[in-house]
């Protein structure tokens, strides 16, 4: 956007270039280039190990973070890692919030992600207008790590719903209930 100087880094350069074909920004080839001088750094990776590598590896972003910067992590990580990142970043006077998202790729593309935030509420308030550009629902959950705990609850609930649906459909199949009629009936009710 014209209000934000956006630098994009992806470990898979093809993904960054594809993104750049559709949106405005500057694709960079290193984490150092991505974060040097940045007021806000946003990450979203796959796992705890990915975050540890991106932040703390020899070519990671940690040494290049600007004092006073805001660091928003949208990765679904462990509570333990969120606390570790918060403590490590505080040592550099970098303000951290763990802010895992729900809504998948479609939610991101359509700007309707749900974000669960843990950390200093003042940091969320300072960055909320930016987060709102790609999300619909932003909920402050409490101290550092609380965003990750909320995401864990979200995942447990989704798993329970999927298991219940699977069990119900298996039961219907075992009783030779017409699946098309059943799905029509239950999709309109509770």
Where are these regions (language model features)?
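NAD(P)+-binding Rossmann beta1-loop-alpha1 motif at the extreme N-terminus of oxidoreductases
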Residues: 1-43, 75, 105
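Glycine-centered short loops/turns at secondary-structure junctions
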Residues: 2-3, 93, 176
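Conserved beta-strand segments of alpha/beta enzyme cores
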Residues: 5, 24-26, 70, 95, ...
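Catalytic-core regions of core metabolic enzymes
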Residues: 7, 14-18, 82-86, 92, ...
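Rossmann-like NAD(P)(H) cofactor-binding subdomain of soluble oxidoreductases
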Residues: 31-36, 40-41, 48-113
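Rossmann-fold dinucleotide-binding core
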Residues: 77-156
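Helical "substrate-binding/catalytic lid" subdomain
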Residues: 146-190
